[in-house]
């Protein structure tokens, strides 16, 4: 894949054969063919546009309760941590929550604005996106 991607345009970190045990709460599992941690949303966009169409993409957040088989993950794994971490309130009663936001942070944000319905997230480890 590195041959097909202009890595000079990437600002994030692209790793080959990255052990998923470093990215899950279970601390087990084989390697991802490629693991990408984008620098920001623009960098993520550049990376995704460079990934070959036939290559599978797997998204991970904190990896809480994510069990990866010993054979690893084919294709590319993209971490949303630190990238898709937006929290916005609009129309006084709606929230936009990015996939990289910790569940407990989302629940607290809603409570701060007097919104209900996601209180259960306070007890769930990990991020909205996994």
Locate the predicted segments by residue.
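Anion-binding (especially nucleotide phosphate/pyrophosphate-binding) glycine-rich loop
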Residues: 2-128
């Amino acid at each position: 894949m590195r041959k097909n991607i202009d890595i000079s345009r990437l600002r994030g970190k692209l790793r080959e054969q990255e052990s998923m045990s470093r990215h899950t709460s279970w601390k087990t599992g084989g390697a991802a063919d490629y693991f990408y941690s984008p620098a920001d949303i623009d960098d993520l966009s550049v990376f995704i546009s460079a990934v070959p169409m036939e290559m599978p993409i797997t998204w991970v957040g904190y990896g809480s309760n994510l069990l990866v088989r010993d054979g690893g993950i084919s294709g590319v794994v993209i971490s949303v941590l630190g990238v898709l971490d937006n929290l916005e309130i609009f129309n006084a009663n709606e929230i936009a929550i990015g996939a990289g936001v910790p569940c407990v942070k989302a629940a607290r944000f809603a409570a701060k604005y007097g919104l209900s319905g996601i209180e259960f997230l306070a007890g769930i480890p990990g991020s909205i996106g996994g």
